[in-house]
Amino acid sequence: VVDDHTVQGKNPQGTVISLFDYWVDEQNSVDFSPNPSLNSGINKNRDLKFNKGQGDGFNGWTGGKTPYSGMVEKTLNSNGYPNLATSWTNGIFYASPLDYLFNENDSTTGGSAKVEGKKAYTNVGGLMQVDDEGYYYYDSTKNFASYDSASNGVKLYDKAGVSYRGTLGQFFPFNSGSDVFTESEGALSAKPGVTADSNNVNHWFGASMSTHFLHPEGGKTTRNQDITYEFSGDDDVWVFIDDVLVGDLGGIHDAASLKIN
């Protein structure tokens, strides 16, 4: 019944969206256990550690909306993925690529390319919508998104789901609509007690989006307004254009935003 309350998503031409599920014990185990292993699964022998924000440096919560800038190099590596920046501040003194987080290899891959604690879902459809000005967007404060393995697409619900400190509308694509909603009198309601801190919410995941676009001369829309690109998220949001870092919201932090004009 909950799935009756969905809206149609769009698939922008030339855009590839992928989702990645990460874990340290088992894929369906609780993320926020009191003492999660910091050296198993996706964390094994890695500098970046999935945890509850209690780590050091970029593995620790910044304490608010302030990102941990300078966490990755200013250009993508030769494989097209970020590298952790080598610096005394980061405590990284050697090449530390993040390919393993965002490539197609996962726990089902054979041989040395296998990545423990990860399942990759590539070319996922249906996440985006189009606003009145022709911009493609996804906004978790308007629509809860849930990955559907049967279609390799996203179910977009007509209501935001999961609250954090009183604000409704979080992005947890590996939770189902029935995990976060109840239905009553033909409408969805947020399920009581399901918050961003709940143990039954899948916190450890990644998403990537690559797109080919042309920026028109003068940088204006058909309405003669500046073309802008806006991003908002918590925990490690990086934006690269032509392999160059142009937006840096790295680190474990509350939701922060950036705008590129």
For the regions a language model picked out, list residue spans one by one.
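Acidic/polar, compositionally biased interaction segments
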Residues: 1-261
